Swiss-Prot record:
NCBIfam families to which the protein is assigned, alphabetical: PRK00819.1-4
Stated name of the protein: Probable RNA 2'-phosphotransferase
Recorded family membership: Belongs to the KptA/TPT1 family.
Keyword Mitochondrion on entry: no
PANTHER family: PUTATIVE PHOSPHOTRANSFERASE, TRNA 2'-PHOSPHOTRANSFERASE 1
Gene Ontology process terms (BP): tRNA processing; tRNA splicing, via endonucleolytic cleavage and ligation
UniProt keyword terms in alphabetical order: NAD, Transferase
Role this protein plays: Removes the 2'-phosphate from RNA via an intermediate in which the phosphate is ADP-ribosylated by NAD followed by a presumed transesterification to release the RNA and generate ADP-ribose 1''-2''-cyclic phosphate (APPR>P). May function as an ADP-ribosylase.
Organism: Streptomyces coelicolor (strain ATCC BAA-471 / A3(2) / M145)
InterPro entries to which the protein is assigned, alphabetical: Ptrans_KptA/Tpt1, RNA_2'-PTrans_C, RNA_2'-PTrans_KptA, RNA_2'-PTrans_N
Length: 182
């Protein structure tokens, strides 16, 4: 499968499993799962046909493991704007997690901390390298270390998704380390 096609199918899956399943007539269960055959049929009926083999390739080769397959069902691993209960267990985070952003967002983050925005949770990376890649999608990256151990000790709840993304509802700014102003 060509890389360009892989990216297109992956983006289509993300859009319709995370955000807009109803646009192609899908109704995920409370955990975000849909039947694979129904997804493939709905995509074809709405002008974006792909095969089960293409879907399997996208799931198997996605470096961020954005999708989970269980038997005959598929869901996005995290990042939903629709209501889902991923049933992720509570987890004890490492001492530090990281958030990738860009400089233009720092003022708002200083004032409000990290908020989920249009998602259900704030997404945190386990290492600086991943956070740098995340921030780079929107410009020159700025990586903010998160004092996850203190947050956890103070009662904040963390979950970790199947693809290693750490999730929490909010990160108050007092747990963030900001870069020195220039």
């Amino acid at each position: 499968m060509q890389q360009e096609r892989t990216v297109k199918v992956s983006k289509y899956l993300s859009k319709h499993l995370r955000h807009q399943p109803e646009r192609i007539g899908l109704t995920p269960d409370e955990g975000g799962w849909v039947e694979i055959d129904a997804l493939v049929a709905a995509a074809a009926a709405h002008g974006f046909p792909f095969t089960r083999q293409e879907l399997d390739h996208v799931v198997a080769t996605n470096d961020k493991r954005r999708f989970a397959v269980e038997g005959t069902r598929i869901r996005a691993s995290q990042g939903h704007s629709i209501a889902v209960d991923l049933r992720l267990p509570v987890a004890t985070p490492p001492p530090y997690l990281y958030h990738g952003t860009v400089a233009r967002h720092l003022e708002a983050i200083r004032a409000e901390g990290l908020r989920p925005m249009n998602r259900h949770d704030v997404h945190l990376s386990p290492d600086r390298e991943t956070a740098t890649r995340v921030g780079a999608r929107r410009g020159r990256p700025v990586v903010l270390p998160v004092d996850a151990a203190t947050m956890h000790r103070d009662g904040h709840v963390f979950h970790v998704s199947a693809n290693g993304v750490w999730l929490t509802q909010h990160v108050p700014s007092r747990y963030l380390r900001f870069p020195a102003p220039h």
